[in-house]
A protein has these predicted regions:
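Boundary at the C-terminal end of the N-terminal hydrophobic targeting segment
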Residues: 4-8
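A short, N-terminal "cap"/entry segment at the start of jelly-roll beta-barrel domains
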Residues: 9-67, 154-172
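Double-stranded beta-helix
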Residues: 31-33, 108, 128-172
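Extracellular/periplasmic catalytic domains that process cell-envelope and extracellular macromolecules
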Residues: 48-50, 61-63, 83-84, 91, ...
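Conserved short histidine dyad/triad with adjacent acidic residue
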Residues: 64-84, 122-124
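Glycine- and acidic-residue-biased ligand/ion/polar-headgroup-sensing regions
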Residues: 74-77, 83-104
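Short beta-strand His + acidic residue motifs that chelate non-heme Fe in jelly-roll/DSBH
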Residues: 79-81, 99-100, 121, 126-132
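Short acidic-glycine-tyrosine-enriched beta hairpin
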Residues: 103-123
Length: 172
């Protein structure tokens, strides 16, 4: 016996013998699937500093619909003030996630969140990150398409020359 979403009548999980219904946000995928750490493919993302990485876990961030991504930022790297049009839920997977709110980077506004913490960020909220105490990994859950706009266009890595392979897709 599984459960279903009343509005879709598509079973999400029915046990090991069933679960073959496909989902609208994962075309061609069965309803039950898993992603283990060794399945995660980290790539450079043009809107991030060159040493930061992004991995698509579920969905397609550049398209309308639910998606889950992971973001890995090495020690001392800052993501300068930016905003996303979509509401987001961040879950800290590892390291300490420092996030502050505002249009200007201000270290005194940073809040530290340990692994397991969940941070809800409403769409169009200006914020910034800093890997202040070492590398961190966050998981972001949202409804796409993913958008990212820097508050100062000079902080946007897409305005600089980058030669490393990157995650493809349109980011508005």
């Amino acid at each position: 016996m599984g459960f279903s979403m009343a509005s879709e009548k598509t079973e999400i999980f029915t046990g090991p013998q069933q679960g073959t219904e496909t989902r609208r946000h994962q075309p061609g995928q069965v309803a039950f699937r898993s992603v283990v750490p060794e399945d995660i493919e980290w790539k450079q993302f043009p809107a991030f500093p060159p040493s930061a990485r992004l991995a698509i876990v579920v969905g397609e961030p550049s398209a309308p619909g639910p998606y889950v991504i992971r973001v890995k930022v090495p020690a001392d790297v800052k993501l300068m003030p930016h905003r996303h049009p979509e509401d987001r839920a961040y879950t800290v997977i590892s390291g300490v996630f420092y996030i502050g709110l505002g249009d200007h980077f201000d270290a005194s506004k940073l809040h530290a969140y340990p692994p397991g913490a969940v941070i809800i960020l409403p769409g169009n909220t200006s914020h910034f990150h800093w890997a202040k105490s070492g590398e961190y990994v966050t998981q972001v859950t949202a409804i796409g398409p993913l958008g990212l706009e820097y508050m100062n266009s000079e902080d946007d890595p897409r305005n600089k020359s980058i030669t490393a392979p990157s995650v493809q897709g349109t980011v508005r």
